[in-house]
Amino acid sequence: MRYLTLIAVFWQVLNCSAYTHSGNPTASGVYPKVGMAAADHLPFGAKVTLPDGTVVVIRDRMGGNYTDKLDLFKETEDECWQFGRRNLLCKIEIPS
């Protein structure tokens, strides 16, 4: 038997920012680490590719019901400040 996995792929300009450790697990129940991100409008497990080729997986929520924001997890507060806030054209892959 063969299975066909469908993946929705689209591009969206996202307002990107960064966050770091709070000591608490993410909304999906796992503890945050580099390579994870928060978004209200994308399902857990969706992959987002940034323009520099970095791929992050949605594992958290922002809590504001935003449809155009992405919050990237960084190891330190300094890395968050260095990243700042950017509007980036991102590739989004949503698994079936």
Q: Where is each model-derived feature located?
A:
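Solvent-exposed, well-ordered loop and adjacent helix/strand elements within mature globular domains
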Residues: 2-96
